[in-house]
Amino acid sequence: MAKLRSATSTQGRNMAGARALWRATGVKDSDFGKPIVAIANSFTQFVPGHVHLKDMGSLVAGAIEEAGGIAKEFNTIAVDDGIAMGHGGMLYSLPSRELIADSVEYMVNAHCADALVCISNCDKITPGMLMAALRLNIPVVFVSGGPMEAGKTKLSDKLIKLDLVDAMVAAADDRVSDEDSEKIERSACPTCGSCSGMFTANSMNCLTEALGLSLPGNGSLLATHSDRRELFLEAGRRVMALANRYYRDDDESALPRNIASFKAFENAMALDIAMGGSSNTVLHLLAAAQEAKVDFTMADIDRLSRQVPHLCKVAPSTPKYHMEDVHRAGGVMGILGELDRAGLLHTDVSHVAGENLKAVLVQYDLVQTQDEAVQQFYAAGPAGIPTTKAFSQSCRWPSLDVDRQEGCIRTREFAFSQEGGLAVLSGNIAADGCIVKTAGVDEANHTFVGHARVYESQDDAVAGILGGEVVAGDVVVIRYEGPKGGPGMQEMLYPTSYLKSKGLGTSCALITDGRFSGGTSGLSIGHVSPEAAAGGTIALVETGDRIEIDIPARSITLAVSDEVLETRRQAMQARGKQAWKPVNRERSVSLALKAYAMLATSADKGAVRDVSKLED
């Protein structure tokens, strides 16, 4: 029998002081010896995806205590990438992932918790908690706050569906009237929850289902729907079942590293490719794999991207479908079911919702389930009423979307495309690879040749786009925005949105060592590695250089000879301490961000810390 970690602080005469303090938190004599389950909540009033989470910890705690455990809740920070977008606040977004991971580790280890429930939702919170859970390797269940309902409004007497990106594009488009822009803004984010498309937050919450660490519906069931209450209660029950399996029965298969195995990471990446998920998921899966001690790399992602078809197309890649539509079609389990039937899924992997993924699919794959309760579960739909309250409505779709030929989720035969929604490109400008969300790229732009227009920062690029410097045929190059060079690897949603608003969304490309919001579409290539600040070739590009992009061939090439590049590299090195740094960029960087930059690796490593610098 594995010893409870909490026994360190609850057992023995020498722990009298610790027990006295535990009693002061409400622990009774009869509780000592029970598993202590930490609840990492990320409630904050700053973020719509988290504003409704305040009472969720109490729901989970009640279920834990009914199942025989002690529940103790704490909070983490949560940055809203949308609110932080377009100014210096975005420098803090990716670094907050490491801070969240560390804070969960600190709390769990400092108090010797035996198990963990992670209540997350938005962009960096789920990845940070995932990294911590795999680092700690104690029984864990994830439960997110759920997606926002899609916005809806009437323009020219036509009802349209909206999300955050639509508001940003409309605001920058001179052809949109002030009245229509305001209508779109007021309708884009109608409820609490993570933004309604297949952006980073929803992508990551879906991926926890595929990794085996969250319950079916976690990524797709609306935040406002009353059915979601049961997910929180069941998370508390499940984590206690996992804790008992490990501590009482010596069953190590209950530990997250044995659930999130290499096969599970392949499943998660296959899901991401099939649903056209955010390119940020690549960054976060690579980081999580390192915490799990799983050798999952960009090479594996490249291999999968060539095998997995695009089975589910969701905003921002199409205005037709949002997360509420994915749920109606069977959610993550519906997509995984189609991957299974295509022979592209490992179903023998463990899962917190059942004996293994195969058993979970039998019950929750909408195509094969005979369970009427599950069918009712996927009928949970939007109410269309603005609210910040969780569980505030119980509306049901009048019918389910089981059309696998023309519906939201397709079979392999009727896939949106036979190659998936993400691709890894490489070439002399990105020797260690870069990422493009092909789900959002027009097929006509799968090959593109243009001339570089180079900017040393996102701010300069935005000014150039809005000021008319960028013209059709340009390849906008934004560098020194990587994990180290930014620092913090800013998202480039404003530059891509402004290209759209200027009518350049399909006639220009954008490449960067920064990253993109899950809301980005168009020929937007990010995560260029090595980044400029790490000596990457992207630092040597000059305005006017020819750049060739070939997605089918998975290549991206700076059409400059090796001899010329070597001359430029030597000139860069001659700058001494100013080498591999932006020229004339004015940016205030705090000590906290400088500390982050000192250890940050490039995107192909997940932008995790370079641990070699910490070794003796």
UniProtKB/Swiss-Prot annotation:
Belongs to the IlvD/Edd family. Pathway: Amino-acid biosynthesis; L-isoleucine biosynthesis; L-isoleucine from 2-oxobutanoate: step 3/4; Amino-acid biosynthesis; L-valine biosynthesis; L-valine from pyruvate: step 3/4. Its cofactor is [2Fe-2S] cluster; Mg(2+). GO terms for cellular component: cytosol. This is Dihydroxy-acid dehydratase. Binds 1 [2Fe-2S] cluster per subunit. This cluster acts as a Lewis acid cofactor. The modification N6-carboxylysine is found at residue 124. The lineage of its organism: Bacteria, Pseudomonadati, Pseudomonadota, Gammaproteobacteria, Alteromonadales.
